Amino acid sequence: GNGAFLLELKKLYPNNKILAFDIKPDIEEIKVLDFLKFDYELIKDKTIHIIGNPPFGRQSSTCKSFIKYCCKFATTISFILPKSFKKESCKKIFLLDFHLKLSIDLDANAFTLDDKDHNVPSIFQIWQKESTKRLVIKDEISKYILFVKKEDNPDLSIRRVGVNTTKCDKEIDDKSVQSHYFVKVKEDIDIDSFLEKFNKLNFNDKDNTVGPKSISKPELIKTVNTIQF
């Protein structure tokens, strides 16, 4: 709302028509408008580049609404987004005819709140509409582990969320079902050997969140499948 994008765009493209909206703008050059109520019918047949920093909302719900709305008429979408949009599950919000062209991590303290630096784990992505649909990455089939319930005599527990995400050991009884996965290792694999290799893996996906670290089953399987026996 303070024109961080607008003022730079006007310098770069002085001859282009630039519309700027915010529900509570800080400068006069930005019109007061709820973007999700913007009437795009008069411009939907033109080349439209949408650039901004949509509000994230709880579990990214608001920025997902912005993305879905933009996909109806945009040629490109360039947004600051929660870091969780590095995950394949979040990328699915974009229609399949949009292709990811750029994704970069923002520096720490990239935001300002009440005139103070504010850190929100975020990225900047550029998506472009094309005539072909992008390929959807399918979840991998697990090679070595089977997810089971705690009461089904699992071999190992794996921390699912929190500061110790992906911590894996044989302790089962004191582990919470809300914060852990429970797995059986396939019968032809030695559990101790698997555990040793597991604990050497680098699970980068666990850091792709705005809140506490976490890892999904598909993300876990993708990395565990790289183990070689």
Where are the regions that the model predicts?
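Class I S-adenosyl-L-methionine-dependent methyltransferase catalytic core
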Residues: 1-229
